[in-house]
Amino acid sequence: MPAVEKIGDNLRLRIFLQPKASKDHLIGLYDNALKISITAPPIDGQANAHLLKFLSKTFKVAKSQIILEKGELSRHKQILIPHPKSIPPVVANLLIETT
């Protein structure tokens, strides 16, 4: 499966998460996944909550609409973003490469 996949009007992302980073940032392709760094620690779901908040702002979608499909307790995650209003250049480039 590619790192970024368009399914109708939705996006499915395979993510490699780096918690406890110095800033929130979309890094790019890493090991066939989109690498994202976030500042939250991986304790009691803080990293997942922070990731969803970051993706919500980045893709301009309500946080409650973003679905964590796989990887709740892992650095490797699969996330579905319904009807993104904005697609960052890093993600758009990966989307173009996979189609």
Swiss-Prot record:
Gene3D superfamilies: YggU-like. InterPro entries: DUF167, YggU-like_sf. GO terms for cellular component: cytoplasm. SMART domains: DUF167. Belongs to the UPF0235 family. PANTHER family: UPF0235 PROTEIN C15ORF40. This is UPF0235 protein HSM_1819.
